[in-house]
């Protein structure tokens, strides 16, 4: 089905052609009222040629306005055929019909149908905006049309500042903006005084003389008498179609109406429409300042909450970490060698169990544990895995804060008697035994040594358990004496008592080890796990509080949707006017969506500004620490504002785009 309309072809082929410009064949229009069907038009046959001046006359309720709406593609026939220069309108979709209205027809309404918040020039420009005409071109054309119609001194006047006759002339200029090959005038003098009515009729006759096809819809025989052809409608039927004496005069040579210029390329036109949507949205928003402010209030509160909570959380984290940094970490490791990566470390065998015993005697040390390790082959039945064997003391799990999911750890007594017992990490237990088998009490081979599993660590991630390595632990004495055959240690892990300055303890440990060894053949590593935990906790708390604040954003978004739905209802007639002059459904949807996004973005900007103001006041009353704002939180706030505008503005925008232009124009 062909959905495109070649407007230029319509202009060209309609000139000096015997083919009717507009043809209705057996057109009927009916409406449902409850269970009853009312037929407004009945089997209408009508042909109108290019350059004609036609009057459709009839009493109120005769169906003449419905006939005009069908002729102008504002309405559709329930039955029959309507062709515009041979193009069947039933084959056209909504966008193609909008293109016909925009580029081919010009409407003049009895009630003018001007947008009250726009001046005369902007009202006239509307059809050209939807045609994608460049701003300068359409502005100049609008001014020229208004000046031609005697409104050169009223270009910046709004409808409320003009008389009825002046408003009607603005409506005529709007009808001519895109060329207006066919002018459809619905009771053009009905709301005017006699003098203004005559002026409007004189203008319409001049347009006819210039080659425009003019169709008047009226109930006044005096107005109809100006036409060269009068069609009388009664009860939905054409009861007469006659020529007047004026047809003896030579008909004007039909000239194509001059459009404002070639339309720009599609991309430029789309960008132009998007820019104009922003301009129109801005005008609409500032025209209702209080409503706009109330609409964005929820967004302002939500954005202020999110940004402020993020800043407070970051400030609190830095404040706490600053205190922790003054204490240091609570775990210190001692290794052989000068530093990490020392090639001589493997040959140094001076870390001994006696060093561990000496460290455990220090009052500022909570516990110290020896550590030896090696990668070993571990077997259970027919399952073999490579795992890291760690020979440690019973205090190791306390030092490293490793929790058990099942079983127990080995005791000092197990260590003294070199008990063949092991504790497995969660991953090792899963690999060896699989699901459904209780590892506790099972016997496995560590190298060639059979060992009984007495415990399994939890699946909780621990800094000291490598996530990509299988681990198991046995008493140091067992590992050194029965598996590895070594007396020296790989490392010593020390846990500092709570409240003790970690850095000072580290220095005491170095002094003790230097005294015992006589040379510095070791190095220490102070792990600040507490600091990392605080950072993680701080991030989690900030996220939690931010999620709570997001609820206010959602509430604000619902408020935006509610107000936008009300706005659609209040501006129904405006939507009908825009559709009548050629706006597509996508144009209407885009405008209301842009309005919603603009409301949310403005609310976001104000909310961020308020957050910084709160931060300034915060520093005046809280001296210990301050709110810390980040670029990420600001960018996130803007992103949230945009997303909320799109999500909660879509439904109102869709509802606006789905309005029927006839019903919309009929709204007060």
UniProtKB/Swiss-Prot annotation:
The gene is syfD. Coiled coil: none annotated. GO terms for molecular function: ATP binding; ATP hydrolysis activity; transmembrane transporter activity. Its main location: membrane. This is Probable syringafactin export ATP-binding/permease protein SyfD. The lineage of its organism: Bacteria, Pseudomonadati, Pseudomonadota, Gammaproteobacteria, Pseudomonadales. SUPFAM superfamilies: P-loop containing nucleoside triphosphate hydrolases (SSF52540). The keyword Cell division does not apply. GO terms for biological process: xenobiotic transport. It is a multi-pass membrane protein. Residues 242-263 are annotated as: Disordered. Induction: Part of a gene cluster involved in the production of six structurally related linear lipopeptides, called syringafactins.
């Amino acid at each position: 089905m062909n959905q495109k309309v070649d407007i230029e072809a319509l202009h060209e082929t309609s000139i000096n052609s015997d083919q009717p410009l507009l043809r209705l064949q057996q057109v009927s229009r009916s409406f449902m009222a409850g269970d009853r069907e009312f037929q407004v038009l009945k089997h209408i046959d009508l042909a109108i040629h290019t350059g004609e001046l036609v009057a459709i006359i009839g009493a109120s309720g005769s169906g003449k306005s419905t006939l005009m709406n069908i002729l102008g593609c504002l309405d559709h026939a329930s039955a029959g055929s309507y062709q515009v220069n041979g193009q069947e309108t039933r084959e056209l979709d909504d966008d193609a019909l909008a293109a016909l209205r925009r580029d081919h027809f010009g409407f003049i309404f009895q009630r003018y149908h001007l947008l009250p918040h726009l001046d005369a020039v902007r009202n006239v420009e509307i059809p050209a905006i939807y045609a994608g005409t460049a701003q300068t071109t359409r502005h100049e054309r609008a001014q020229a049309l208004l000046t031609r119609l005697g409104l050169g001194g009223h270009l910046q006047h709004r409808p409320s500042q003009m008389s009825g006759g002046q408003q009607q002339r603005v409506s005529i200029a709007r009808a001519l903006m895109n060329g207006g090959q066919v002018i459809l005038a619905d009771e053009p003098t009905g709301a005017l005084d006699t003098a203004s009515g005559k002026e409007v009729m004189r203008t319409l006759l001049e347009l006819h003389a210039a080659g425009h096809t003019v169709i008047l819809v009226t109930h006044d025989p005096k107005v109809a008498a100006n036409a060269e052809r009068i069609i009388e409608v009664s009860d939905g039927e054409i009861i007469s179609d006659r020529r007047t004496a004026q047809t003896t005069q030579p008909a004007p040579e039909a000239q194509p109406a001059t459009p404002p210029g070639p339309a720009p390329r599609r991309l430029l036109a789309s960008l132009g429409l998007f820019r104009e949507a922003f301009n129109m949205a801005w005008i609409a928003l500032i025209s209702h300042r209080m409503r706009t402010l109330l609409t964005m209030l929820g967004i302002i509160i939500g954005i202020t909450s999110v940004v402020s909570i993020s800043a407070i959380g970051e400030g609190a984290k830095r404040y706490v970490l600053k205190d922790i940094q003054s204490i240091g970490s609570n775990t210190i490791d001692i290794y052989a060698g000068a530093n990490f990566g020392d090639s001589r470390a493997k040959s140094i065998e001076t870390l001994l169990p006696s060093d561990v015993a000496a460290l455990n005697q220090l009052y500022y040390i909570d516990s110290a544990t020896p550590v030896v390790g090696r990668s070993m082959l571990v077997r259970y039945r027919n399952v073999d895995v490579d795992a890291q064997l760690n020979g440690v003391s019973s205090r190791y799990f306390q030092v490293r804060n490793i929790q058990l999911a099942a079983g127990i750890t080995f005791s000092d007594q197990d260590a003294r008697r070199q008990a063949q017992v092991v504790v497995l990490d969660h991953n090792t237990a899963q690999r060896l035994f699989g699901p459904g088998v209780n590892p506790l009490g099972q016997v496995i081979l560590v190298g060639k040594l059979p060992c009984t599993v007495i415990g399994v660590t939890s699946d909780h991630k621990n800094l000291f358990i490598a996530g990509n390595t299988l681990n198991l632990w046995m008493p140091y004495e067992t590992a050194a004496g029965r598996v590895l055959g070594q007396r020296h240690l790989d490392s010593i892990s020390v846990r500092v008592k709570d409240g003790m300055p970690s850095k000072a303890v580290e220095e005491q440990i170095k002094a003790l080890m230097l005294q015992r060894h006589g040379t510095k053949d070791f190095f220490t590593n102070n792990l600040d796990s507490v600091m990392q935990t605080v950072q993680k906790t701080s991030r989690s708390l900030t996220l939690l509080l931010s999620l709570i604040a997001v609820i206010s954003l959602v509430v604000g978004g619902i408020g935006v949707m509610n107000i936008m739905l009300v706005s659609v209802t209040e501006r129904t007639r405006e939507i009908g006017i825009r559709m009548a002059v050629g706006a597509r459904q996508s144009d209407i949807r885009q405008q209301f969506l842009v309005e919603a996004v603009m409301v949310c973005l403005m609310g976001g900007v104000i909310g961020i500004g308020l957050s910084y103001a709160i931060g300034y006041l915060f520093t005046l009353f809280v001296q210990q620490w301050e709110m810390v704002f980040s670029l990420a939180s600001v960018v996130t706030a803007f992103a949230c504002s945009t997303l909320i505008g799109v999500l909660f503005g879509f439904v109102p925008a869709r509802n606006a785009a789905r309005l029927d232009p006839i019903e919309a124009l009929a709204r007060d």
